[in-house]
Structure formats: structure tokens, C-alpha cells
Amino acid sequence: MVKFILKRIGTMIIAMFMIILITFTLMHSIPGGPFTNTKGVPEEVTQAMEAKYGLDQPMPVQFVKYLGSLLHGDFGSSYKYTGKTVNDFIATGAPVSAKLGLVTLVFVLLTSIPMGILAALKNGKWQDMLLMAIATIGVTIPSFVIASMLIYVFSFKLNVLPTFGLDSWKSYILPVIAMGGYSVSYLARLMRSSLLEVMGQDYIRTARAKGLTEFAVVTKHALRNALIPVITVLGPTVAGLLTGSFVVEKIFAIPGIGYYFVNSVTQRDYTTIMGVTIFFAAFLMAMVLLVDIFYCLIDPRIKFDA
């Protein structure tokens, strides 16, 4: 296992370097910059600001300096918010996104897995068709559309739920549903198809022939193997939920990482874009690694490929 983990960490380092290089190149290749097209600012002031942050230097020089800062844990200063660093945004935004993400993750797991199990056990019946119809709708509708519909119905029309912030338990309801809608639908469909496949295996028929109840067959024999495909996709799902949904956080004015990222994109705040991208990529890779390890532990038939 140690060799497997070390190999994956080496691969992650290479992938992270490529992500940093590509993102940095794209940010600095886009016409204009964080200080261009600013109304009422003389050209001399713009040039002075670019010189202050080293944006007047050749791109390779800027990249090497940026890598040096990253090695010291410094994501740089924000170009748009005086006195603020990207580390400040991550330090303040990550806990907010993580808190919202944990609530959403609990909602997703407690909803999607039972939905998938029930649909599989009622295969072909009205319960199955109803649940899969809901799941199909949830997969096809984007999160920002769901968020807008929820705000219109429950905030504007019924006036029963707040539309911004995370001040009370009620304020979690709309963003959690908007963020988790796709994941619930996708995992429910995956859980259903996986359980149906497992229920058709020979060892399940053998368990039934021994006189085990359907509940025992499902919980003791089928469910563990049926969860393996679900666990496989949990890595990116958990990473996406815990780091926040960019659009949903912006719509509900939740000051998480996604909220800062959207603002940085619209304002061309290069360092914030880079910092949030690197943070998200690193967290995603770490979650995928943890899921791979857990994947091998839950199914002894799978061996670590060192």
C-alpha cells in the first residue's frame, strides 16, 4: 500500500504542476489584465501597478517567481482587494464552503442511496418509474436553474425561506437542495443500476435458495458490492461539495470559495483565480486518492497496483 500511495502522490505532483502551468499560461494569455480598462485611471498609474506586482516582467520570470511563492505556501496578494491575500480568501471561504458542503453531502447520501435501493427493489413498478423520472429531471437541470426556481417559489411567492447567507438552519435548505440536486439524481441512478446488476449474480441466487429473507440478501450480500461504483465517484463528488458550488454560492451570496472565485473571474484577479484553482485541484486529488484506498479496502479482490 505504501508503494501505491507514493506512486499516486508522485503522479499528483506532476498533475498539479501541469495544472499550475496551464492555468497560469491561460490567465496571462488573455488580452488585457487586472488593471486595464479601468475607467478614470491614467496610463501611468496602470503601468505603476503592473510594475508593483511584476506583471511587466516576461511570463517565464513571473511563473518561476509564482512557483517560488507557492513552495512557501504563499498564493500571492489580491490585485483587486488592497491588503488582502489569496490565503485570506481561502482561510475565510474554505470553512464556509466546507460547512455547507458537509450538510449537502449528508443530504445527498441520505437521499440518493435509499432512492436507488428502493428503485432497484421495485424494478419496473410505479415507484421505480417515479423515482427515476425525478432523478432524470435532477440530472438534466443545471444547479443555477434549480436555485433560481427555488428562490422564486419559496422566497418570492411563499416567502418562507431566506435567499442569502447562512444565518440560520432555514438558510441552508435552498442552497443544499440546489447544490445536491444533481449528485442525488446521479448517485440514485448509479445505485439502482449497480444493485440490479449485483442482484442478478449467482451468489445472490444461492443466498435466496438457502432461505434467507430478502432483507438479509440485500443488506448482507448485495449492498456492499453494489456500493463499490458509488464509492468510486464519491471522490470528485465530495471534493466538489466541500469546496462549494461556484454558481450556487454566488446566487445565494454565500461567502465561500466559489463566491470569491466568481468575483475574481469577473474582475480578472489572476492570483485569486490561480489560488482557488490550485486549492480545488489539490483537494480533488486528495479525495480521489482516499477513495481509491477505501475502494481497495472495501473489496479485498482488488489489489494495489504499485
Features from the language model and the residues they span:
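Alpha-helical transmembrane segments of integral membrane proteins
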Residues: 2-3, 94-127, 143, 166-306
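Membrane-water interface segments at the C-terminal ends of transmembrane alpha-helices
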Residues: 23-29, 66-68, 133-162, 180-182
